C-alpha cells in the first residue's frame, strides 16, 4: 500500500507541502492542473512546475486526479475526436514526469454531489452531507448556486466555467440513456487506452458519487455489476478502476470488501473513506473509523492486505475539525488522522501475517 495525499497546488490549497511531508508514510501527491478546463491539453511547462514543487519535498507525481473528460465525449458528439486527441496529448505529457495512474470519471454534467458542504455533527465538527429528498425535489440550478456561493475554493467538478453552461448541458442529456453513455465510454477507451498502455499509465475510472442517477442524468459506474461490465470493456493492462469506498459505499447494497476481493488486480488506486447512511437515504461523511460509519473500513483494508495490494491509496475526504478553514472535505487534520488509522490497520494485518508465517 503506497500512501498519497491529494493536493490542489500552490495558492489553491490551505494545506502546504511542508505540512503533508510531516504525515508519516506519505510518499506522493495526487495532483492535477486545476486551472485547465476539460478538453484542453495540459502543457508540459505547467506540469514541470508542479514537478519542481513536488521535488523540493521528495514527493512523486505517480497519480493524476483528474484529467477531466469533456462533455462532448460523454455525449458522443462529432466534436469528441478533437477533445480525445487533446486527452491523448495530456497523457503523453504527464507520463514525462513519471505518472503511473490517471484517475478520471464519466459522470455527466456534475461531478460528486452534496447538499451541504459543512453539515454540523454531534461533536461540533462539520462534514459533507447528502440529503436525498432535497436532491429529489431540487432544481439542479439551485444546487449549483448554493454550492458555488458557499465554496471558499473552486471544487473539482464544480468549476465556474463548467457550470456556466448548465442549461445547455442539462438539455443535451435529455435523450441520453445509460446504454448511450456506456457506448460513448467504450469509444473513449478504445482511443485512449493504447496511448496510456504505450506510456505505462493505467486509466482508473472513479465510481459515480453518489452511485445513482441525480436530476435524471444517466450514471453507470454504480455497483459491483457495473464494475464488472466496465472491466469487460477491455483487457488492456491500462484499464482499471479507482475503488472509492465512500462513493460506492453510499449505497448499502454495495459490499465494498467483496468488490475489492473480486477485482483487486484491476485496482491501481484506492480512495478509502467512510460514510454514515441513514434510513431515508441521506448520508454524511465521517471519520475513517468503522464504528463511525456504515462502511467497514477495517475489512476494506484487510481485503487489500490479504490480496497483496501494492497500489496507491489516499484517505479521500475528511471532516472539518479543530476550527480548520479549508476546502470542503480536503482539510489537513482529519485526512492526516485518516492516514494514521489506515496505517494502524495495515500494520496490524502485517504483524498478524508475520506471526502466522513464523
UniProtKB/Swiss-Prot annotation:
Organism: Shouchella clausii (strain KSM-K16) (Alkalihalobacillus clausii)
A Pfam family hit: UxuA
Similarity section: Belongs to the mannonate dehydratase family.
Secreted in keyword set: no
Gene Ontology terms, MF aspect: ferrous iron binding; manganese ion binding; mannonate dehydratase activity
Example GO BP: D-glucuronate catabolic process
Name of the gene this protein is made from: uxuA
EC number: 4.2.1.8
Keywords: Iron, Lyase, Manganese
Enzyme class: lyase
Protein name per the record: Mannonate dehydratase
PANTHER family per UniProt: MANNONATE DEHYDRATASE
InterPro entries: Man_deHydtase, Xyl_isomerase-like_sf
Amino acid at each position: 500500500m503506497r500512501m498519497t495525499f491529494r493536493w490542489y497546488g500552490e495558492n489553491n490549497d490551505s494545506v502546504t507541502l511542508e505540512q503533508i511531508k510531516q504525515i508519516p508514510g506519505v510518499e506522493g501527491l495526487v495532483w492535477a492542473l486545476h486551472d485547465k478546463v476539460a478538453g484542453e491539453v495540459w502543457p508540459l511547462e505547467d506540469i514541470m512546475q508542479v514537478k519542481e514543487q513536488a521535488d523540493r519535498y521528495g514527493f512523486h507525481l505517480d497519480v493524476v486526479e483528474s484529467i477531466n473528460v469533456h462533455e462532448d465525449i460523454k455525449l458522443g458528439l462529432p466534436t469528441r475526436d478533437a477533445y480525445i486527441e487533446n486527452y491523448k496529448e495530456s497523457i503523453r505529457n504527464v507520463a514525462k514526469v513519471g505518472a503511473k495512474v490517471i484517475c478520471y470519471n464519466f459522470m455527466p454534467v456534475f461531478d460528486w454531489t452534496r447538499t451541504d458542504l459543512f453539515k454540523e455533527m454531534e461533536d461540533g465538527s462539520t462534514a459533507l452531507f447528502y440529503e436525498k429528498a432535497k436532491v429529489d425535489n431540487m432544481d439542479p440550478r439551485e444546487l449549483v448556486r448554493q454550492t458555488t456561493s458557499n465554496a471558499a475554493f473552486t471544487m473539482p467538478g464544480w468549476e465556474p466555467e463548467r457550470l456556466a453552461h448548465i442549461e445547455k448541458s442539462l438539455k443535451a442529456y435529455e435523450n441520453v440513456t445509460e446504454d448511450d453513455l456506456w457506448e460513448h465510454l467504450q469509444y473513449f477507451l478504445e482511443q485512449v487506452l493504447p496511448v496510456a498502455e504505450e506510456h505505462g499509465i493505467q486509466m482508473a475510472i472513479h465510481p459515480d458519487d453518489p452511485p445513482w442517477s441525480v436530476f435524471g442524468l444517466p450514471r453507470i459506474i454504480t455497483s459491483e455489476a457495473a464494475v464488472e461490465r466496465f472491466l469487460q470493456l477491455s483487457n488492456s493492462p491500462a484499464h482499471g478502476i479507482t475503488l472509492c469506498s465512500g462513493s460506492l459505499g453510499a449505497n448499502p447494497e454495495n459490499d465494498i470488501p467483496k468488490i475489492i476481493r473480486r477485482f483487486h488486480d484491476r485496482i491501481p488506486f484506492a480512495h478509502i473513506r467512510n460514510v454514515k447512511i441513514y434510513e431515508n437515504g441521506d448520508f454524511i461523511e465521517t471519520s475513517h473509523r468503522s464504528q463511525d460509519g456504515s462502511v467497514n473500513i477495517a475489512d476494506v483494508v484487510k481485503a487489500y492486505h490479504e490480496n497483496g495490494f501494492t497500489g496507491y491509496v489516499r484517505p479521500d475526504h475528511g471532516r472539518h475539525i479543530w476550527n480548520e478553514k479549508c476546502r470542503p472535505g480536503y482539510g489537513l487534520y482529519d485526512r492526516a488522522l485518516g492516514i494514521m488509522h489506515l496505517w494502524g490497520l495495515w500494520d496490524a494485518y502485517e504483524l498478524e501475517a508475520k506471526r502466522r508465517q513464523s
